[in-house]
């Protein structure tokens, strides 16, 4: 799938959108989103272009980047602003600079990431990202560690700026064979318990019920 990252200044954003709404482009990445109104304005332009160019209305999906304190404060309304939205992420480099942080280190950004994650889950869209710097493409062990933290926290993917980062993200956010086998075994044990009339059952020494399965 092809997503085009447009520019933020409005005049440049509109020009980029004009150039990007085509059948081959399935979505846009919107940087420095500050409000739901900004999303709605750009969606009006996108809809006009889809109509003009014979595309289904809603063809073009959106991923938004939260990169400013104002955008962070409005993250819940932004996440639920349009049916076009499919994902939201914290833009760690720009956001950390706006906040006066020395570096976009994992722990310094963790609470902000989780706020964005909650907003995404509430809105039914994908939370994207990982604690740490997207610019880290030399220390791949650190990059892998950050990606694995995000996976454990419940994020659904991450962005990258260098080809060396791609296989690491694919590995981090793809269930392993052992995870798949464990999930299948859990479902089997639970289904057998339900068939026997039990509401909960032990699996690997812990109770499992509907929320867990």
Identify the residue ranges that each predicted region occupies.
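Expand to "…catalyze enediolate/carbanion chemistry for C-C bond making/breaking, isomerization
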Residues: 1-213
